Every structure is written in C-alpha cells, then in structure tokens.
Amino acid sequence: MDSGKYWERVLRCSKNMSLSRVRRTFSIMGRDEDSSDNDLAAFYYPALQAADIFELEVDIAFGGMDQRKAHMYMREVAEKNQWTKPTCIHTPMLSGLKGPGGRMDSFDHKMSKSDPENAILLDDDSESIRTKIRKSFLDVGNDKSPIFEISQHVIMPKLGKVVVSPDPKYGKPSEWTDQQQFVDAVSNGEIHPLDAKMAVADALFEVLEPISQHFSDKQDLIESINSISGKS
C-alpha cells in the first residue's frame, strides 16, 4: 500500500471490536471459531482484509460464501466509522477436485488456487481441464461431489445442458438439461462416471474458452502472475 494512512486504517478497523466478534469471521481462513486461540495472527487478518477494501475504495466486494462473515465485519466497521459501506456479492463455493464435496457452511474442501491440481484456473487450456477433471474425485452417490457442483453452478446456468458423448462402443450420446436427472443417471449407472467427467470437462472449457483465448497471447502476464503466486 502506498498510503501512509494504511496502518491507521487497520487500527481503526480493530477498534471497538471484541475478540468474540472477530472469531466469528474465521471461516475466511477455513477455521472454526475456537481453532485460533493459539494463533494471534488470525485475529489480525479480518482487520487487514477490511482495511484493504477501504483503501482500495471498493464499491462491490466480491467473493465466495467463505468471505461473507468477514464482509459483514467490514460493513460493521464502516458503519462505526461512518465510512462508505461496499455492497457485497457472494458466490457458492466449489469443492476441490481431489476431495468430496462438503456442506455449504464448511470450507475445508474448497477449490483453491494454492493447489493448482485441485482447482480449475481461468487460464487453463482444454487439455489441462480434461486432465484435471479426469483425475478428479467423483462419488456417484453424492450430489455435492466436485463434478456435480461444477455442473450445477457453472454449466447448467451458462449452457443449459450437459452433453455426454461416450465411445460409440459403449453407448449413444445424450443431453441432460435437468441437474438432478444428470446426477441420478450417473448414480444409477446409466452414464459411466468417466463419460460424465469428460462431458463436464468439455462443457467447462466451452464456458472458459474466451478467457483462455484472452490470455493465450499474454504469456508474459501469466508468468508475472505465477511469479507472485509461486506457481511454476
């Protein structure tokens, strides 16, 4: 931050907030309220995050559902200090590709860029997406499995259907416009899990292809981002 007022802002974000109130924000770090009593840094984080939003003069704070409690904390801070309160928009969380889906209020298995093989990155090309999805976890009886979550929250709203195209030796192509019927078809064996994965992979790339194309000739930018994030 270039602003010499930043740390003053952090202190103002901390003032008049109790420890119990700060604990209620800990889902932003994938922790429960009682897990950070031996980690003082955890209590700093909500104030730092709130200060960032104010210093950047953000009008709309956008994040996953795991950010909701921290954003509500930020809005309380704004009200106490008579600062502008940003609007907050929160999206569903997608489970990481390697593990089973969890409840919406549990973020232990969320997709995260900190593990690129466990997540779909916006600049992934078609082959990367297919490889990651092929290796991903699919519990056929669990509609919260990562593959089903991607279908529900990304593909169905954007494309309106999942197109399954198995090897002709094993079946005929099929289209699914209803999420639950798609899940049921995989669960009862009508669709082979691998065919379901590849259908989701192809549909996901169709959604993300414009972004992938945008970054295809900006390798210097990608390398700069990777150098900051530590991605090789």
Could you tell me what each predicted segment is?
Residues M1-H90:
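Divalent-metal (Mg2+/Mn2+/Ca2+)-assisted nucleotide/phosphate chemistry catalytic cores
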Residues A50, R68-S232:
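Conserved nucleotide- and phosphate/pyrophosphate-binding catalytic cores
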